[in-house]
């Protein structure tokens, strides 16, 4: 599967304006991340790890990762002593979706506490997401949506609408998370493949 994705990426780099190739790439990336990189991570320093019930140490000896990106960040948290405490999917934040107007629950990817070089202790809530799913906002805070497909087939329109809905849902989640963090003394951040250092 990794070989297939690399070949599609190679074709896409030669044809960056091809909507069809881009959609195929996103499809295979979603399959690859969901079906081939889920698993259980066993932290080498479980005393730093907290699970959804607040248990630490020996009671938190396995953690589920849902993408290779999450696995890479788990290894980072586990390795460095500057990360004092961390956990995956330990915080639930209620939010109102822009798509259906209903209340849902957002389970954040990571919680961690770190000691910065200055000695300051900072608490973070972190989301790991592809850059393509990260909404860009204008100066008024409105989402900048991707251009609609030039080929107006129903399939292309559905794919475009789905991508727009993903941006709207993520914006709803992250706005709620930012409010929660301001109220509780946390910092909210979103990491993409660029920050994690993953290349396709």
Language-model segments: residues:
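Electrostatic, structured charged patches in enzyme active sites and in nucleic-acid/phosphate-binding
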Residues: 4, 8, 16-17, 21-200
């Amino acid at each position: 599967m990794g070989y297939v994705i690399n070949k599609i990426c190679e074709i896409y780099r030669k044809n960056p304006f091809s909507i069809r190739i881009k959609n195929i790439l996103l499809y295979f990336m979603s399959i690859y991340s969901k079906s081939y990189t889920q698993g259980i991570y066993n932290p080498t320093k479980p005393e730093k790890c907290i699970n959804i019930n607040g248990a630490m140490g020996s009671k938190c000896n396995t953690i589920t990762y849902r993408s290779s990106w999450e696995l890479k960040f788990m290894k980072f948290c586990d390795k460095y002593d500057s990360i004092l405490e961390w956990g995956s999917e330990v915080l639930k934040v209620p939010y109102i979706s822009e798509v259906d107007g209903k209340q849902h629950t957002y389970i954040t990817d990571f919680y961690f506490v770190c000691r910065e070089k200055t000695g300051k202790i900072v608490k973070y809530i972190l989301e790991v997401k592809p850059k393509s799913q990260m909404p860009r906002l204008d100066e008024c805070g409105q989402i900048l949506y991707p251009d609609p497909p030039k080929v107006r087939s129903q399939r292309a329109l559905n794919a475009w609408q789905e991508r727009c809905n993903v941006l709207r849902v993520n914006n709803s989640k992250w706005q709620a998370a930012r409010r929660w963090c301001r109220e509780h003394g946390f910092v909210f951040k979103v990491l993409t493949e660029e920050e994690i250092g993953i290349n396709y």
